[in-house]
């Protein structure tokens, strides 16, 4: 492959930005952040559950599945890699008990969700039978007949043809594949469980059986990432022609394997690309997708056809929908 030099984006006005990637970077998904919650606020939480919902506000449901084949070295979510089928069934039972409690509250009871999101962890780690048990229980408590979108995160190595068919039959409309990169060495050194061949197989069959939307995730600036490998990954992603692509920049929060190694070695700077490089690589990716006809719709997302491809979960989150989150460490 011929060498390509990625031009830097224009420098922002104002004070210089931090260049090195250090530990402790994280995003705030809710406000105020959990770290600022106080014991004396619990009565306010219960009071909110006992109020009738505001008229016209849609309801969304986030369900956390915290199981994985292995923990990625950069992962900062609550995950388990050592649970057997009996322990997983116990977790699913508890999930439905939690949803039962919420479904009995005035703010939730009688409402039908507009969008549902299965995140993790790895939701596709569950077997088809486990998934059916969970979703049947959820539908009995909060019917899905008015749902516009069901998003389901999947790790390519767990997505057999049989499981993909089962996921589609459950009503999933938006499959989000955690690809992250197409280079097997990059995947291995960063602790990913899947490899590039599994990406191609899972993606092709997901297309064949007609998922309405397929999103793929990429991460810029992973451990041992190079400009050449990033260019190749972007080219392969464009060639797949997914409905949307979410592009993250590598971060190293404190509860990651990378940080533990940094701490043991007394290092302050993470062994990943610096912020300037990551911004440049993301800018390059956006440019390549735009050349292929995609539209940038957020700071992390490009979409093939904005008139057709909607991300109802994100739109609801940004516009003030009620979102009920269930499961360990859900948000």
Regions found by a protein language model. Name each.
Residues 1-60, 69, 109:
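Flexible, acidic/Gly-rich N-terminal and inter-domain linker regions that tether
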Residues 60, 73, 150:
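Divalent metal-dependent hydrolysis catalytic cores, especially in the metallo-beta-lactamase
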Residues 61-63, 177:
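Short beta-strand motif preference
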Residues 63, 216, 247, 299, ...:
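Short glycine/serine/threonine-enriched helix-capping/active-site loop
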Residues 63-79:
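Local cysteine-cluster metal-coordination motifs and their immediate loop/turn environment
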Residues 69, 252, 330-331:
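Short, solvent-exposed loop/turn segments at secondary-structure junctions
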Residues 79-287:
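Conserved non-cysteine loop/helix-boundary elements of the Radical SAM core domain that shape
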Residues 259-331:
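A C-terminal junction/extension of Radical SAM enzymes
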């Amino acid at each position: 492959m011929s060498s390509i030099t990625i031009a830097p984006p224009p420098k922002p006005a104002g004070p210089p930005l931090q260049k090195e990637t250090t530990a402790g970077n994280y995003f705030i998904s809710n406000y105020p952040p959990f770290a600022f919650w106080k014991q004396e606020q619990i009565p306010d939480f219960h009071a909110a559950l006992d109020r009738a919902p505001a008229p016209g506000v849609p309801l969304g449901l986030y369900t956390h599945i915290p199981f994985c084949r292995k923990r990625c070295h950069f992962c900062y979510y609550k995950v388990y890699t050592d649970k057997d089928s009996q322990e997983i069934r116990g977790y699913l039972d508890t999930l439905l008990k939690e949803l039962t409690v919420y479904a009995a509250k005035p703010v939730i009871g009688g409402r039908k969700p507009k969008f549902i999101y299965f995140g993790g962890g790895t939701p596709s780690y569950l077997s088809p039978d486990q998934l059916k048990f969970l979703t049947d229980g959820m539908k009995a408590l909060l019917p899905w007949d008015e749902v516009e979108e069901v998003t389901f995160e999947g790790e390519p190595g767990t997505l057999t043809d049989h499981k993909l068919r089962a996921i589609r039959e459950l009503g999933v409309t938006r499959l989000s594949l955690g690809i992250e990169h197409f280079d097997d060495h990059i995947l291995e050194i960063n602790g990913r469980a899947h490899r590039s061949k599994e990406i191609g197989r899972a993606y092709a069959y997901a297309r064949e059986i007609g998922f309405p939307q397929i999103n793929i995730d990429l991460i810029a600036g992973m451990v041992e990432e190079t400009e050449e490998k990033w260019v190749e990954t972007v080219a392969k992603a464009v060639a797949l022609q997914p409905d949307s692509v979410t592009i993250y920049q590598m971060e190293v929060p404190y509860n990651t394997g990378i940080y533990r190694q940094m701490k043991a070695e007394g290092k302050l700077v993470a062994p990943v690309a610096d912020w300037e490089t990551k911004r440049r690589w993301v800018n390059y990716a956006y440019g390549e997708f735009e050349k292929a006809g995609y539209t940038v719709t957020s700071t992390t997302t490009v979409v093939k056809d904005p008139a057709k491809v909607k991300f109802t979960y994100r739109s609801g989150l940004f516009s003030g929908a009620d979102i009920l989150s269930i499961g360990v460490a859900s948000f």
